Amino acid sequence: SNKYADRGELFEGLEIWEDEKYREIQGTYPVIFFSFAKIKQTTYKETIEKIKKIIFDLYQEYAFIGKWDGLTDKEKENFNNISYDMSDVIAQEAIVDLSNYLSRYYGKKVIILLDEYDTPMQEAYVNGFWDELASFTRSLFNSTFKTNPYLERAIMTGITRVSKESVFSDLNNLEVVTTTSNKYMTASGFTEEEGFNSLEKFGYGDKKEEIKKWYDGFVFGKITDIYNPWSILNFLDKGKIDTYWANTSSNGLVSKLVREGDADLKSVFEELLKGKNILCPIDEQIVYNQLDDDSEAVWSLLLASGYLKVVSIEKKVVGKRQLYELSLTNMEVLDMFYDMVRGWFKKSAGNYNAFVKALLINDVEAMNEYMNVISEEIFSNFDVGTKPSKLQPERFYHGFVLGLLVDLAEDYIVTSNRESGF
């Protein structure tokens, strides 16, 4: 960025500074950087308001441009009209307009960096306004990244790879780099050498094996043993092993998909929690509006988000999708999922009756006590009959217990006397 012109000392001693071509361009390009990482609003209106505030703050950062004589009177007026309450159309064109002004002021095309472009989209899916936000975002991205003649290049980072059809349908010349790509394999985390060197430097050399279990496991392309940099840095700062990554990613979306998934999906998820591997096809492009209808898409999302890692790639292909052997990435992810599942039960525990609560913790004595109290205080002879040889009492008790178990229908498979011939 030209904000750091003549600040070469920031890079001295680093490998990148040894390359002359990088030294020559350091501090010469105007850079527009903005992040959607904190856009986690639960309504469309609040989300758009937050995006507009980010755009307004960008303009404030370059407020001096609004007074530049190189702008026409109309352009100065447009510059000063950027506000929190600007129209959607103005907001969608604001970044390309700013690119125009900066390019002319500095005499060079701009570089645009957008961090976590997909965070508001995840919230939109979870909270039910995906279609509205996708439409707005598609127009914003089209003007910013496709029809922008003042753009040198752009980089967008995200937790998931949103499908081209969702918001990138208007964009060309996209180069997509994912966890399975061989490009930039060591750029997204600490290698084992880097991680272990940092442990030695901070006096934690004896913690290497424990740190490996908790924070290793990420796989990028052909490189294994990539460590979570956020967790490593937090450990070095606090000296305590913990789930530092737990609230920094797409947990809300993952929780929704697993919690609302069918019985087969929950069964596979349970296998992962037991430390077992799963075999499934993967499609790295996430089509959000199809997630509810495609139970296998959750595994693609978990892989893209870093919760799962590739153990091996099978030769077999299912449809157009490659078959992968996957496992949970590390102990930190396992601990995070345990907390997530416990949270589900805490939220729903109050909705379970006493009999179901006793059943879930295998407390047979409490189950018997509950049934005895109900039988003595509520049941009538007309309900249970007077002769044990009759079928009617058994049917009554059967129906009563089935009614008690209805609370579990969303989380467990509850069947009753299916016509199976037994």
Regions found by a protein language model. Give the residues of each.
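P-loop NTPase motor core
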Residues: 4-64
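Structural recognition of the conserved hydrophobic beta-strand(s) that form the central parallel beta-sheet
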Residues: 33, 111-115, 135, 139, ...
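Short regulatory helix/loop adjacent to the ATP-binding pocket of P-loop NTPases
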Residues: 44, 145-151, 162-180
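Substrate-engagement module of ASCE P-loop NTPases
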Residues: 59, 94-106, 132-152
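Short glycine-rich substrate-engagement loop in P-loop NTPases that contacts/grips substrate
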Residues: 80-99
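Conserved P-loop NTPase "ATPase switch" module shared by AAA+ and STAND
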Residues: 106-130
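Amphipathic alpha-helical segments of the small helical/lid subdomains adjacent to P-loop NTPase cores
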Residues: 166-170, 177-235, 268
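Extended alpha-helical interface modules used as scaffolds for assembling large macromolecular complexes
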Residues: 174-175, 226-422
